[in-house]
């Protein structure tokens, strides 16, 4: 198994596949907070929050806080795609964010609370999108990729499960 990509690398779906799998993406986005909370509780009970998932990788604590940071960005990217004409989405330095004191000194419970509320709003928003809204586009300045809303949802559906895979590696 590739520990960096425990569920495999992201492959962006074509438009037809993304459209056909919207329900799956919504399910994954909606269920992620409970899954991460369950894993976090086990990691905490076994005193493993500060163990990296692989040599040179983030600790479980960093992964959990990263999910909150990244998915806040994701939610805002989805909202911008729904409300602006082909917005430009900007990257951020996630590796540097993972070293800041709000990651190293704050209990993971804070990020679990963020994920619960955020994913409820995000899944609710996406569940009400029309076909035309799912086809709205945004340009990601860091990757140079133009995303449709459904391919953006596919990306973050994968992203959550990707990091769940990292948390499971720590528990092994």
Which residues does each PLM region occupy?
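A short small-residue
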Residues: 9-16, 95-103, 142
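Short, contiguous, helix-prone interaction/anchoring segments in small proteins
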Residues: 19-54
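Solvent-exposed interaction patches of small proteins and small membrane subunits
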Residues: 17-27, 52, 84, 105-106, ...
């Amino acid at each position: 198994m590739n520990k960096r990509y425990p569920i495999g690398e992201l492959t962006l779906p074509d438009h037809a596949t993304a459209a056909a799998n919207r329900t799956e993406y919504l399910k994954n986005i909606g269920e992620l907070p409970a899954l991460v909370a369950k894993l976090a509780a086990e990691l905490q009970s076994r005193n493993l929050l500060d163990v990296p998932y692989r040599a040179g990788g983030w600790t479980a604590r960093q992964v959990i806080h990263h999910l909150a940071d990244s998915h806040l960005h994701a939610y805002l990217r989805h909202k911008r795609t729904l409300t602006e004409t082909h917005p430009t989405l900007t990257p951020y330095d996630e590796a540097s964010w993972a070293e800041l004191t709000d990651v190293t000194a704050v209990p993971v419970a804070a990020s679990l609370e963020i994920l619960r509320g955020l994913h409820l709003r995000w899944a609710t928003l996406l569940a009400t999108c029309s076909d035309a809204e799912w086809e709205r586009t945004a340009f990601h300045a860091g990757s140079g990729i133009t995303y449709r809303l459904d391919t953006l949802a596919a990306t973050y559906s994968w992203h959550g499960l990707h990091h769940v895979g990292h948390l499971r590696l720590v528990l092994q």
